[in-house]
Amino acid sequence: MSSISLIPVCTDVAIRDMADMASAIWHEYWPIVLSEGQIDYMVDTMQSFEPIKYEIRQEGYLYWFVLDEEGKRVGYLSVRPETPEGELATDIQPGEGKLFVSKVYLLKEERGKHYASRMLDFCEDFCRANGLSSLYLHVNKHNEMGIRAYKGRGWYIAEDSVSDIGNGYVMDDYIMAKEVALS
């Protein structure tokens, strides 16, 4: 099974590198589902330097580069610990919080190597280490490969979500969730 390591993204240089990787991944992966205009808009407003920096510095998101066995960057991961109400979790009782898995992305040539499974294992371990009893994420309803992979790991569709993201675009997602045993 492929192993990974995760390196925290904290500096402006690392954030810029991550934004470059995000743009490359998004422009390669999403044209089968989203228009080029929506991809550009979402990268600019959610996956570029300023939005990532804001999420890290102001909203409590944690970002990591994912490295393969040789130390090569193969993708990135982002999460945010939250209260049951969806607020940033800073001081909660064990079992009361949840983990928002915001971003799970791999470069094209790195998919199919079980890195995404290791990334999700990391998220579950993060929950156990921090007393968070569940995980959730948003997945595009047309991302059949992602939905199938999550279901195969015990995730379930918790609800439908259609969100206006501005500029005439919407995110048409499923919110998928998974409970985590803390003991």
Q: Where do the protein language model's features map onto the residues?
A:
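Short C-terminal domain-edge/linker segments immediately following a structured domain
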Residues: 37, 49, 108-111, 115, ...
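Acetyl-CoA-dependent GNAT
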Residues: 8-32, 38-109, 120-122, 126, ...
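C-terminal "cap" of GNAT-fold acetyltransferases
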Residues: 3, 12, 93-99, 133-136, ...
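Conserved glycine-rich acetyl-CoA-binding loop
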Residues: 104-121, 128-130, 141-148, 152
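Intrinsic low-complexity, intrinsically disordered segments enriched in polar/basic residues
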Residues: 1-2, 74
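A short, hydrophobic/aromatic-rich structural module that often spans a beta strand
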Residues: 73-81, 123-145, 158
